[in-house]
């Protein structure tokens, strides 16, 4: 990342006085970072979703393709811009230090229940698909769309920007 501008910094202050903390955080704020204060416990709970779930799903895509024997190169002629972005995320993660991700994923005590919920969600969606009827899938989709209603507009705009950048490069 070339700059802190727009990056998120989670501050979990412990054993630091308020003046020293304010001075430290002001360095990040001057560089354009967004600061969120959190307890260590809340940080780990949220990171179980923000990092743990996200990276686990990315690794699951890679593992699934490897098990199927479908290389990223073989999918090239079939890829859509969204798929290309997904493959970029997979490739980016796999090009990094595995120890960083091993520590991040294995040392967060809140991640196992998140992954259990993910497995249950995947099983629910799989059952809906395997039913051969569109109704169960539509029901899941509608519930999830309602839950995410607060971000769907901005998410569409942001991903439209990414897709446009992908197809114009």
State the predicted function of each range.
Residues 31-53:
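Conserved Rossmann-fold dehydrogenase catalytic segment
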Residues 74-151:
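Interdomain hinge/lid region at the active-site interface
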Residues 142, 146-169:
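Composition-driven low-complexity repeats that form or flank extended alpha-helical/coiled-coil segments
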Residues 1-34:
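Rossmann-fold dinucleotide-binding core
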Residues 48-89:
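Amphipathic alpha-helical blocks and their helix-capping loop/short-beta junctions
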